[in-house]
């Protein structure tokens, strides 16, 4: 029976400011028209790079999107890697929607832009205080017929 027990969630860090580097994991849902994708997401962000490891709901790694100063790479399980200039173009290829890690990092740390034409209408559905920083636990972003939901299960600041 102990093998079935889930580990208790990690306590939130005490943050004095938004960290330049962090690791977050949780669930990502993207819906556009009739297309709908649900996945587990493990995100590692450093000042100059992002890595998203996208897994099936059962935990099998499906794809990895990495970006840095030299561009971005999409690696799918069992397929050749694809390169592009931007992270967004590869998330569009993978999920049908261009997702900007800079925008999502801002939302994660409590910044939600207004709903100007063409921008995401972002709602922080649930957040927690981590020292002086509000960390979003549940985010809903809508732009046109696209709905993106992110649920953050674990978060930790990293040294950069």
What are the functions of these language-model segments?
Residues 37-39, 61-63, 82-83, 146-150:
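Short beta-strand segments
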Residues 40-42, 62-66, 71, 121-126, ...:
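Short, surface-exposed charged micro-motifs
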Residues 34-36, 58, 77-79, 117-119, ...:
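Glycine-centered tight beta-turn/hairpin loop motif at sheet-sheet or coil-to-beta transitions
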Residues 109-160:
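Gly/Pro-enriched, hydrophobic low-complexity segments
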Residues 2-19:
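Bacterial Sec signal peptide processing site at the extreme N-terminus
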Residues 20-58, 62:
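Post-signal-peptide N-terminal segment of Sec-exported extracytoplasmic proteins
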């Amino acid at each position: 029976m102990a093998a079935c027990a889930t580990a208790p969630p990690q306590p939130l860090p005490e943050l004095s400011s938004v960290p330049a580097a962090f690791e977050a994991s949780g669930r990502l849902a993207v819906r556009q028209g009739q297309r709908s994708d649900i996945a587990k997401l493990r995100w590692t962000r450093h000042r100059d790079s992002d890595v998203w490891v996208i897994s099936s709901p059962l935990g099998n790694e499906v794809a990895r999107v990495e970006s840095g100063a030299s561009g971005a790479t999409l690696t799918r399980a069992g397929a050749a890697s694809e390169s592009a200039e931007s992270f967004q173009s590869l998330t569009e290829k993978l999920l049908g929607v261009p997702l900007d890690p800079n925008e999502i990092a801002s939302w994660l740390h409590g910044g939600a832009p207004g709903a100007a034409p063409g921008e995401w209408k972002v709602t922080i559905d649930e957040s927690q205080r981590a020292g002086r920083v509000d960390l979003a636990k549940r985010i809903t972003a809508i732009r046109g017929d696209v709905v993106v939901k992110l649920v953050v299960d674990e978060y930790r600041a990293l040294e950069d």
